Amino acid sequence: MSGEQQLDADLGSGVEVEEFSWEDYLEETGSTTVPYASFKHVDIRLQNGFAPGMKLEVALKNDPETYWVATIITACEQLLLLRYEGYGEDRKADFWCDIRKAGLYPIGWCQQNKKTLEAPEGIRDKVSDWNAFLQQTLIGACGPPVSLLEGLRNGRNPLDLIAPGSKLECQDFRDSLSTWLVTVVENIGGRLKLRYEGLESRDGFEHWLYYLDPFLHHIGWAAQQGCDLQPPLAIKHLKSEADWQEILAKVKEEEPLPSYLFKDKQVIGTHEFSINMKLEAVDPWSPFGISPATIAKVFDDKYFLVEMDDLRPEDHTRRSFVCHANSPGIFPVQWSLKNGLHINPPPGFRSQDFDWADYLKQCGAEAAPQKCFPQSISEHQFKENMKLEAVNPLFPEEVCIATVTAVRGSYLWLQLEGSKKPVPEFIVSAESMNIFPLGWCETNGHPLSTPRRARGHKLRKIAVVQPEKQILSSRTVHEGLKNQLNSTHSVMINGKYCCPKIYFNHRCFSGPYLNKGRIAELPQCVGPGNCVLVLREVLTLLINAAYKPSRVLRELQLDKDSVWHGCGEVLKAKYKGKSYRATVEIVRTADRVTEFCRQTCIKLECCPNLFGPRMVLDTCSENCSVLTKTKYTHYYGKKKNKRIGRPPGGHSNLSCALKKSSKRRKRRKNIFVHKKKRSSASVDNTPVGSPQGSGGEDEEDADDGDEDSLTEGSTSEQQEELQEESEVSEKKSSSSSPTQSETPTPLPPDTQTNKRDAQTSSVSDDENKPPSPKEIRIEVDERLHLDSNPLKWSVADVVRFIRSTDCAPLARIFLDQEIDGQALLLLTLPTVQECMDLKLGPAIKLCHHIERIKFAFYEQFAN
């Protein structure tokens, strides 16, 4: 596998996308949405066929077997406000009902089905003769269509009656205006996928229309208008005339959809256009600009054919479309100029600049007068930078997020975001039925194409490039990441609250609180997305990557002297079976993210570049590779305060008495020291313990246990060497370390005792008290003879030793956490369990080998 393929595999694995959230997206981009009321066609769909004043028979609430006549007061989507007849203007007994659940029946249903029709108890004594009252009340009354009520009782909304397989009539709006039958393939929220009757999907003549489109009608409309049903010219040649007539006869036998479903369609008025009039138009098949056009044909007083001008030879296909007086996308001459827009000259136009006066003279035509065009709608709520959902004009089956980039009168310029293929900015009318409000797709179960950045802003799982897989050169990795970022750059929108990608630079110094191995397992980056959401996720990951999550949470918790003025977020940490919570302040705006990340790193005493918007490849600008992570532990003994480690400038002295720690301990301070070259002189000059910065701040939190020091930063040569060795099976590793040899030479009994008393151990609480010398006994035949001082061992030396033991599978942990000889000698059972996440059994086995090294160290090199 090539480097690029490996990179793609690593970066592309494990990506899981959550649902798109409009609320989060609007906050991230700092934008607003078009008001719901701006989409009249959607609002009409929700009117459901019921209207105030309609009367029906409804079951009484306290007696479902008894019914009474009620009047619709208000209709709101699927809810009706009803009032029983007899209450007059009294509203106290008005009640709401769900049209899909309530028992609603047409007037006369009770009589036909022998059901009891009786007034409610509250008004029963108000009228002496209810039959006469009803006869008088129901004179001239109207009710909902019977088919509508029957559909509701079957659990269907009015619009659901237009089900797949339903038949409609559709006018051909491309060139001929011929009317033919279409079959509904899909109905998604009133948006219909249609196929010409008699054809199959493979024939490729499917198209999408909204059910209120003026060219779509119920069965029987053509006959009412005196038109013949004829297949469009584009498909007429596919079958014989006899076949078409046979198809027509079959459809006439089927029960048609109720015509009331289309009662809210736009009424087509008469026009005043004449043949050869010139105008400006938007080509509906390519709505990316405005061009000159001509009235090519007038069908009748309602419809006419507009043809886009084309000055090329006659063999070019002419693009045309049928219009009516209120059709969108047609404008009077000079409309573009008056609105500050560019008009695209017709194909074949030779001059550089297009001028309407010269063009009309050249064509010998006249401009269509202003009175022929509908009045522009000036009152609408569309504004620039607002968000909505819109149909892709090139791929009508796709609905995308769209941004209003410009508004001219009643026309909008939209830019799609997240479309499968790039689509230029296009023009639609503010009354277009191909645009929808926020959440329309989610409400109706229609797929919504969203920007790549938006799709990934809440990733549960992000591609992680593990350290052992980074065999590629840094240049290859960098180029791969650069290409990945560039691929999404075009669809990114920077907003005030949009946080950039936050990178975890695991090669940087991780400080005393964070586990370097766990940081290396974190995602390479989080985001982009909402600042609060991204930074909350980053801090949560860091807390979980700590030796003691509760301690890091305490370091991050909200400070009363904070200067960020952000928002407080409650974060959680779990440690030793206990849960901790604290309020942490997080910045809200993108301009403060970089400094927030830097200051948080400083607070955690790690490299300022450990995480942030900047990705560190090879060399950190802070030169953090020379820092080591060494801790100085102070605690209270029973008799006096003792210090662990060597005195300043003294010889190596790792001994401390194994005394029981008190419940109340001093807080340990951590300082950074520069890493010395590992020479014989460095042992004396680089103390394992130093009084510098050792603190006196008391601490009572039970979660602040002892953490052993892990030295940061092995050289790149060591890293490469160990990467190669890691491919070798642990089982085949040598039984002896290159730095050791077994020896049966016993120690004198008194020497043995003294050495055991001098073993190094971090003092922990009572539960995790390290094992006493009696618990870990070094047998005579297990003693080591070390060829070199373990205090000077590099990470590679430590890993080689571990691989030579029966704890070889744990060598990876030592490599990941870069534990060198100094750190190895400081390890104890509690810290091995806590810092390496080992269970008691493996931890004891590992500590057994560590104690052997310590014992050999005291015997051979301590003096």
From Swiss-Prot:
Keyword Transcription regulation (UniProt): yes
Q: GO molecular function of the protein, one example?
A: transcription corepressor activity
Composition bias type Low complexity, residue spans: 734-744
This protein's GO CC annotations: nucleoplasm; nucleus
Record-linked Gene3D superfamilies = 2.30.30.140, SLED domain, Transcription Factor, Ets-1
Keywords from UniProt, A to Z, are: Chromatin regulator, Differentiation, Nucleus, Phosphoprotein, Repeat, Repressor, Spermatogenesis, Transcription, Transcription regulation
The SAM domain is annotated at 793-861
**Which portions of the chain have biased composition (kind: Acidic residues)?**
696-710, 718-727
The lineage's top-level taxon is Eukaryota
Q: Where are stretches of biased composition, namely Polar residues?
A: 680-691
Task: Please classify the protein's predominant subcellular localization into one broad category.
Answer: nucleus
Q: Where in the cell is it found?
A: Nucleus
Positions of MBT repeats: 20-120, 128-232, 242-346, 354-451
Task: Give the UniProt record's GO annotations in the biological process aspect.
Answer: cell differentiation; chromatin organization; negative regulation of DNA-templated transcription; negative regulation of muscle organ development; spermatogenesis
**Residues recorded with modification Phosphoserine:** S764, S772
Query: In what tissue types does this protein appear?
Result: Highly expressed in the testis, low expression is detected in brain, kidney, heart and lung. Highly expressed in germ cells, where it associates with the synaptic regions of meiotic chromosomes in pachytene stage spermatocytes.
Compositional bias per record (Basic residues), positions renumbered to this chain: 660-679
Query: Region entry Disordered: which residue ranges?
Result: 638-773
Q: What does this protein do?
A: Histone-binding protein, which is part of various corepressor complexes. Mediates the recruitment of corepressor complexes to target genes, followed by chromatin compaction and repression of transcription. Plays a role during myogenesis: required for the maintenance of undifferentiated states of myogenic progenitor cells via interaction with MYOD1. Interaction with MYOD1 leads to the recruitment of associated corepressors and silencing of MYOD1 target genes. Part of the SLC complex in germ cells, where it may play a role during spermatogenesis.
Entry's free-text remark on domains: The MBT repeats mediate binding to histones tails; however, in contrast to other MBT repeats, does not bind specific histone lysine modifications. The MBT repeats lack the conserved Asp and aromatic cage at conserved positions.
Q: How does it assemble?
A: Interacts with MYOD1. Component of the SLC (SFMBT1-LSD1-CoREST) corepressor complex, which also contains KDM1A/LSD1 and RCOR1/CoREST. Interacts with KDM1A/LSD1 and RCOR1/CoREST. Interacts with MYOD1. Interacts with L3MBTL3.
Protein's recorded name = Scm-like with four MBT domains protein 1
What is the organism of origin for this protein?
Mus musculus
Please spell out the taxonomic lineage of the organism that makes this protein: Eukaryota, Metazoa, Chordata, Craniata, Vertebrata
Gene field: Sfmbt1
